[in-house]
Structure formats: C-alpha cells, structure tokens
Amino acid sequence: MKILDTEDKIIKILKSNTEMMMTEEDKLTHKNSTHCRFCHKELNGDSVRDHCHVTGKYRGASHNKCNINFKETPEEKRRVISIPVFFHNLTGYDGHLIIKGLNDKKFGNIRMIAQNFEKYMTFQVRHLKFLDSFNFLSSSLDKLSSNLAQEGEHKFNNTLNNITDQEQRNLLLRKGVYPYEYITNKEVFEETQLPPIEKFYSSLNECSISESDYQHAQDVWNKFNIKNIGEYHDLYLKTDVLILADVFENFINTAVEFYNLDPCHYLTLPNFAWDAMLRKTEIELDQLTDIDKYQMIEKGLRGGISMITHRHGEANNKYLKDYDPSKESTYLSYLDANNLYGWAMIQQLPESNFNFVDKELSEILSTDDDDNHGYIVEVDLHYPKELHDLHNDYPLAPEQMIVNDNDLSAYQLDLKNKMELKNSKVGKLVPNLNDKKRYVLHYRNLKYYLDKGLIVTKLHRVLQFTQSNWLKTYIDFNTNQRAKAKNSFEKDFFKLMNNAVFGKTMENVRNHSDIQLINDGDKFTKLASKPKYKSCVIFDENLVAVECHKTTVKLNKPNSN
C-alpha cells in the first residue's frame, strides 16, 4: 500500500533529531524575551532556548522546567508516534471502505474509538491515525471551499502548487460535480464523453445538477483535455483531496493563530475547543469526587426539548398570492435567539466548593443570579390545576419518561390503535403537567418556575457551590473575533468554537462505547469468552468488530487538566 510506504518516510523524519539553528534575528528575539512560550509567565532569568527537534528551528524562550516537560503531543508522552490522516465524512461512510481492508494480521493491533458499529470516529493502523475532518468542520466540502474562496485564491496553496495553468486553477477552486449514480461499473470509465445532465440526478437530493454546474463539468472536461470518464473521475478525486487539504490547513492556521493549539492532536472540535477554553480562561475547575454530588448533577441533565405544540398552521394576509380578504388576517412568525449558547455561557456558572448544605427555601430564592454562591436543589413540585390550560402548549419542568397509554388522550389512543403503533420502550424528554417528585434543577430555574405558579411541596437536598462567569473571557473573545472575521469560513469557525464548548460542559461518559476491531481469530475467541462480551459484527472470515460492556466508568468530566 502506498500510504504505508509514505508512513515509513514520515516516521524517519519524525524520529530525526536536528540540532538547533538560530538566525541573528532569533538570537535578538531570545535576548528580548520576557515570558515563557509555554506557561506565559515571566522568565525572571530562568530562560532556555526551545527548538523543534525535527527541523532544528528556534521556537522561543522558555523556563528550563517547561522545556523539559514539554512534549509535542499526548502520544509522544507515551512514546507513540501518530500520523494524522484526514477524510471528510470518515465517520459516516469512508471509514467502512478502509476498515474492510484491514483483515490481515500484518496490520497488527488496530486501536479505535467508535460510537457504534456504523460510526467509527477514529482508528489507528500502525502509526497512521485516521480522523474525520467533518468532526471539526461540519459542512459540505462545497460550502467550505466556497467560504474560503471569498478570501482569494492564495488560500488554496496545495491546489495552486499542483495546477499551474491559471484557467485550470479557476475551474478547480470549487467543489466539482460528479454523476454518482451513473457510475455503476468500471466499464463506464471507458466512455469518451460526459453523460447527459439528467444522469447527474441524485436520489438523496431528489434533483439533478443545475445548468451552470453541468457547464462547469464540461469546461473541466475540455480545459483538461480529458479523454474518458475514468480520467474525469481521477481528476475529481484529486481535486477533492487538494481542496480538503487547503480547507483544513487554513483551519489549522486559524486555530494556531488564535489559540496556539493544533487541531490535528484532537478527535473532534469539542475536544479542541475545550482545551482552547482552558488556555484562554486559565480556570481550574473542582473535580467532583463524591458520587452523591455527581449523580445529583447527572439527574438534572435532561437534554433539549424537541416538540410541536401547534401541528398545522396557515397564514392569510395581503402579502400572499392566495390571500382571502373575507377571512381574518393571520401571520406565521419564525423566531430565533441570536447567540443563545453564548449568552447562556457568560452567566454565573458552577466552579468549585461543591457541598451539601442545610438551607431554607426562602434563603435560596432570595439569592441573586450573580451572587458568588449558587445552588442545585432537589425538590417536589406541585403543578396547580388552574395553570393547566394556560401552560398546556409548553409545560414547565420537563421530565425524562417512558410514555404509557395512561399518558395519552382518547384521540391519541384512537390514532395509535388505528395505525397499530406500539409503545416506545425508550424514555423521552416530555413537557407535562404532572406533579414532580425529587426533581433536580438550578436555583434560577426554580425561581422562574415558582414565579409562573408552581409550588414547592418539599425541599430534599441542596448542593451549594462557588460560581463565577469564568467562561465569559473565552465566549467574548470568540464573539469579538467573529465580528472581525473577513469571510464566512472564519465566521463559522468562531461560532462553532463557542457552541462546541457547551456540549463538553455536560459530557456523559457513561454513553461511551467499547468497540474493538479484531483481525486475529485467537484474539476474537478469547474476547468472546469473557463476561463483558456484548455483540459483534462480522465483516469477513478475518475481520470482526466486537462491542463489550464497560466494566468500569471513569467519571472525570468536565475537567481542567
């Protein structure tokens, strides 16, 4: 395999140890340095020269201890060299093609992280660590390249270096078009002209390409003197790879410029964003070690509500073609909160000193939103019947519950029986008008619920903590950078850097899967005989994916280490 040959060459480079080379400018920079390049604290005479051991390039001044402790990557700390290999949509599709080719013992132990048998986030073969660029830039390559092109063609270094003709360059600085469903066998590659436009139809999108896209395909065919569809196919793939390289390298450059971190050392954008946040805020969060406190907070994490309260609406007003003046004028409104995640994350948030305390309800309710101390409470709530009609469209205090027949109206039961539907065995987050028992929530939510008419019938537990707006520095930084952004690529990037952190603040490690890829029959037999064995998917006689029950769970999120 050519990629394995390339791996050997890269390993030789990474294992090299080049002496430091300093220019006169480097020497002057080092002499005038006042802060460590690693910890950013003052040097105060404790200054050594840090350099890249691969290139020999001087990187900056640092404390002696910081320089000794620094490792290029987490893998290097374990003396393991990993070479990142990026695919766009590796998790959802492309990864399957590669995995099915790993059915040989020569590839050794294959390390992987998977969500399930269909979605492989990353897997490592020898030193090659396969990653999904879509987990960082969750848009189509077409949109990503279009956004980047707003800044100019100089952003596409890889593409420009491989294509010298300017007219050809202009054609390739965008996502190409391809007749996916027309290519059904290798004989099609011998055809000497593009298929008609209707053959570019996509069942997934339920449409064909536009006339301008088809003209673009013809221009590419003619300008590159393509002889058959096979050559068109190869150029299409080459262009995709070059554009992805340009897009991701620009993403890396932006990340390093603003956060001094390289995304290639992370699995997903949320992983990267969390470390970027820790660098910006320098926050040290308390790590919960009391299981009762941890489980109480877990109980309050319910997810987001997704529901339809009004199933069908029609507008009738003078701006519509079918306006009926004899009927009442009505409008449909679409409402969206700007920077909702950002606003939520600049509030006072739990930070440290989590302790169970004895507090009166009145004392909790009188605590200001921006007080130095906050509370998570466990209460019984009564939902007065006189509020049911008023709150029916959007009840307060939603709950995770399995919906049974007793929870359905007569109309819903009739509909269920007519359609022969079965009750779901999976819990859903359901807004309802029932009373609540041992309901866990933040004290600001409790104040809101009581203001709207709910009643606390019993206060069970109170978890007090020190709070501050410790995320505000990071959120404001990204918001300001987004306002200064010169193109859509950067605007989307800084928005994602805020939103990605939100999910990491409430990551549920219990949901992590333990899936292994086995290409050794003896190893599979040994694993399948263990009590933790759960299930497997057989790819062929030499390759199987095995899922195991987790024997331990490390409750270590969120953390600031």
Model-derived features: where do they sit?
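Metal-dependent nucleotidyl/phosphoryl-transfer cores and adjacent nucleic-acid-binding surfaces
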Residues: 1-561
